[in-house]
């Protein structure tokens, strides 16, 4: 949705729903329907000062479409003020935290907790999947809404009107009221009680039972005899136990507040200290690791403790929140798996869904019901002709390996996403997939060994992936102008010459598997932003890549000399393959580059000006990170020998721009760290190279927080590692660290330690007096060690 202009004259603010550090949220109603751009009459509007606004929350919300997540309608800029207005679904309900505070002992029954956790598991599996990769980063009871289903009238204090008690409201009204105390209790009218509007009243405990949920009701000894509340049996007002009654009729939550959420790419790093401190995972609180999808899992465990009445400020000896004793063994185990200190060993949501604390039958039913409306996946053995009506209303189809039947036009009119198995090699007929937006062909597909007819690929198609065998020409008009992404798998046969006009001007992503044809100027469209040239590509680049490309990957065989016109001027990400070893003279790399990756063969000296100041991430890859290349044994041996004979090239301040914050150096680069040579703002260093002396002060900058030294084997001195470092790795599986007595010299800021030592040195009780007590995560030879050392479970 485009940005709107928010006009106060078009909205009536009905109530304030909440306030926070960044703004406030109000309930608002349209009073002038013309020109608002919002089709919903009542919205929740988040109002944020433009000075603190980022588009992050909007970009996240636009990706989400799930019945258990708050809906996003659009956003606008204030017409007369300096605010941003985010229009969202108004949720008729209350935060779980509000209901929790009304409960005896501030805790929910475990069966209710389990139901809420199931909904949260469904939400997390949705936002964490590989399509969205979203981290919520603030999961807690305040951000979980229990939603009214408009069939039961019970207010936030538990006054249940279905049996005529507690409230004068009728049964078809909201069980979450916003009326004043007098009106709810039946002791006043709207005219004479406007002054007390929206006040809350204490929980009333009375005798009897709620007809809705069957909960026992007890007498409220403090209630006045003059109260005009409705009565049951003995004439006393009634209140049900809130959570049992409300959840039995609601059966639905919604997750809100994605203001702190982030997208991630598996290893994405977010060092910012955000979230709620009581629910914050250690990797975020200590700023020594990455905020990842598993960070939400820690918060899920804390949220369960919160709903169970636990005190999140009360920690055990490991720094984890204490789990309430009254919970079942199954629930406790579920929480323990959420609260694993090391995120690398913490369960993800897919593993937790299989835990016996979760009702797997309900999970399966929810997922199956969702999939049944949109997706069908066939077994590998299926190989029957699809008939008209077989796949009506199906949006996604995945065929197994054996399927190899012609798709008859009219049989897949609703299918938007289709994936063929490895055996499929029938010609794609015109109008056979009229609505498809994404098509993936298997390994043997070659379109019946003939080019596509114009119109065979539908005008709706946005993404096509070809397997290994496809090698047919693309004449102008074959690929539709709707196409955004075109992928040829690595190792595939496609190697046809691409002519001007064969690729539509709409393409933004092009991945050419093992393509090795010279690309003439004008062949690649100016819409292209992501280009990957496969492993076999080794052609000159000058003038062939459009200026629009911002991400460029060159395959392992590429080793052509570069000039100033080779790399596009807007390129931000540039990756060279393993073979590249040409000079990078000043001016070759544009000043737009932020991430540069050099392969393990690169061994040229970097002089001042070789690397632009825009670079923030520089990676020297080493052989272990490369895929196997098609050298024969002799070539590999000679290549390694040549590298070993080259002189050692020191890293110098002139060769590394000050802007770099992340640096990885491979073991074959023959570079060594020298005094004060690393960029001053460096935060993360992975160093596979050797050392010719111990680290001394100022070798590592004071900005650095994460250091991995795979071949370091000198004594650690108090000044060797800066106090800013909270995460450290010493040694590797092939290069053990033997100076273990010096580990006691770590500064107190160190939290995360990973070491590889000789098996003879692994004596836990000897290490007890060496490893500092401040360490909260310890991994020895790849195994996670329980802390503190020497404490038996």
From Swiss-Prot:
One Pfam family this sequence matches: FNIP
InterPro entries: FNIP, Kinase-like_dom_sf, Prot_kinase_dom, Protein_kinase_ATP_BS, Ser/Thr_kinase_AS, STK_FNIP-Repeat
UniProt keyword annotations, A-Z: ATP-binding, Kinase, Magnesium, Metal-binding, Nucleotide-binding, Repeat, Serine/threonine-protein kinase, Transferase
Taxonomy, superkingdom: Eukaryota
FNIP repeat intervals: 403-444, 470-514, 515-557, 558-601, 691-733
Residues that hold ATP according to the record: 17-25, 46
Enzyme class, first EC level, given as a word: transferase
Catalytic activity, as annotated: L-seryl-[protein] + ATP = O-phospho-L-seryl-[protein] + ADP + H(+); L-threonyl-[protein] + ATP = O-phospho-L-threonyl-[protein] + ADP + H(+)
The protein's Enzyme Commission number: 2.7.11.1
GO molecular function, one term: protein serine kinase activity
Entry keyword Nucleotide-binding: yes
Every Protein kinase domain range: 11-358
Residues at the catalytic site: 138 (proton acceptor)
SUPFAM superfamilies: L domain-like, Protein kinase-like (PK-like)
Known cofactor(s): Mg(2+)
Family from the record: Belongs to the protein kinase superfamily. STE Ser/Thr protein kinase family.
Protein name per Swiss-Prot or TrEMBL: Probable serine/threonine-protein kinase fnkA
Species annotation: Dictyostelium discoideum (Social amoeba)
Protein's gene: fnkA
């Amino acid at each position: 949705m485009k940005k709107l202009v928010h006009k106060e004259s078009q909205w009536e603010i009905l109530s304030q729903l909440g306030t926070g550090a960044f703004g406030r949220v109000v309930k608002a109603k349209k009073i002038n329907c013309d020109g608002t751009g919002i089709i919903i009459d009542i919205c929740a509007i988040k109002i944020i000062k433009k000075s603190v606004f980022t588009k992050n929350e909007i970009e996240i919300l636009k990706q989400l479409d799930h019945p258990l997540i708050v809906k996003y309608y659009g956003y606008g800029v204030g017409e007369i003020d300096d605010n941003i207005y985010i229009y969202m679904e108004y949720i008729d309900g209350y935060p779980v935290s509000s209901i929790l505070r009304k409960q005896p002992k501030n805790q929910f029954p475990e069966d209710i907790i389990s139901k809420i956790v199931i909904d949260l598991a469904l939400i997390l599996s949705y936002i964490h999947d590989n399509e969205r990769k979203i981290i919520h980063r603030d999961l807690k009871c305040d951000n979980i809404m229990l939603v009214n289903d408009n069939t039961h009238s019970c207010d936030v204090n538990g006054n249940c009107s279905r049996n005529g008690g507690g409230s004068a409201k009728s049964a078809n009204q909201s069980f979450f009221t916003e009326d004043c105390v007098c009106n709810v209790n039946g002791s006043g009218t709207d005219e004479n009680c406007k002054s007390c509007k929206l006040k809350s009243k204490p929980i009333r405990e009375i005798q009897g039972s709620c007809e809705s949920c069957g909960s026992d009701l007890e007498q409220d000894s403090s209630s006045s005899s003059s109260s005009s509340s409705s009565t049951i049996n003995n004439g006393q007002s009634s209140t049900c136990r809130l959570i049992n009654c409300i959840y039995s009729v609601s059966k639905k939550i919604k997750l809100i507040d994605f203001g702190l959420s982030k997208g991630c790419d598996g290893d994405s790093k977010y060092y910012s200290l955000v979230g709620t401190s009581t629910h914050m995972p250690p990797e975020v609180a200590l700023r020594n690791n990455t905020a990842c999808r598993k960070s939400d899992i820690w918060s899920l465990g804390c949220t369960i403790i919160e709903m169970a009445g636990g005190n999140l400020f009360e920690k055990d000896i490991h720094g984890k929140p204490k789990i309430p004793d009254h919970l079942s063994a199954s629930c406790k185990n579920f929480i323990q798996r959420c609260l694993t200190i090391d995120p690398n060993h913490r369960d993800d949501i897919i593993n937790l869904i299989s835990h016996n604390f979760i009702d797997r039958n309900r999970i399966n039913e929810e997922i199956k019901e969702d999939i049944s409306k949109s997706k069908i996946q066939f077994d590998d053995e299926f190989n029957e002709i699809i008939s008209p009506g077989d796949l009506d209303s199906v949006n996604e189809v995945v065929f197994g390996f054996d399927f190899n039947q012609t798709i008859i036009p009219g049989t897949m009119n609703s299918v938007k996403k289709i994936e063929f198995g490895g055996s499929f090699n029938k010609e794609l007929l015109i109008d056979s997939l009229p609505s498809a937006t994404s098509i993936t062909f298997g390994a043997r597909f070659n379109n019946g060994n003939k080019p596509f007819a114009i119109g065979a690929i539908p005008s709706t198609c946005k993404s096509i992936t070809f397997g290994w065998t496809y090698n047919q020409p693309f004449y102008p008009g074959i690929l539709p102008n709707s196409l955004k992404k075109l992928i040829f798998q690595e190792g595939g046969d496609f190697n046809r010459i691409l002519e001007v006009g064969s690729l539509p001007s709409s393409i933004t992503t092009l991945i050419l598997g093992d393509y090795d044809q010279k690309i003439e100027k004008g062949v690649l469209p100016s819409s292209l932003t992501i280009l990957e040239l496969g492993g076999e590509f080794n052609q000159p680049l000058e003038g062939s890549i459009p200026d629009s490309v911002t991400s460029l990957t060159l395959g392992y065989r590429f080793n052509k000399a570069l000039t100033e016109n080779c790399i596009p001027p807007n390129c931000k990400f540039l990756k060279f393959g393993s073979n590249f070893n040409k000079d990078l003279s000043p001016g070759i790399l544009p000043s737009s580059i932020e991430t540069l990756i050099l392969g393990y063969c690169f061994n040229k000296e970097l002089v001042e000006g070789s690397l632009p100041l825009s670079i923030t991430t520089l990676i020297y890859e080493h052989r272990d990170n490369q895929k196997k290349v098609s050298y024969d044994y002799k070539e590999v041996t000679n290549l390694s020998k040549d590298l070993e004979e080259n002189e050692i090239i020191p890293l110098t301040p002139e060769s590394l721009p000050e802007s770099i914050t992340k640096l990885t150096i491979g073991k074959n680069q023959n570079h060594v760290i020298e005094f004060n040579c690393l960029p001053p703002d460096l935060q993360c260093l992975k160093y596979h190279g050797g050392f010719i002396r111990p680290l001394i002060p100022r070798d590592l900058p004071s900005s650095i927080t994460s250091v991995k030294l795979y071949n370091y084997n000198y004594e650690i001195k108090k000044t060797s590692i800066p106090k800013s470092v909270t995460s450290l790795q010493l040694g590797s599986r092939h290069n053990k660290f033997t100076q273990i007595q010096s580990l006691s010299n770590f500064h107190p800021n160190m939290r995360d330690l990973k070491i590889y030592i000789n098996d003879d040195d692994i004596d836990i009780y000897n290490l007890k007096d060496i490893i500092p007590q401040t360490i909260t995560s310890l991994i020895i030879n790849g195994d996670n060690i329980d802390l503190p050392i020497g404490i038996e479970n």
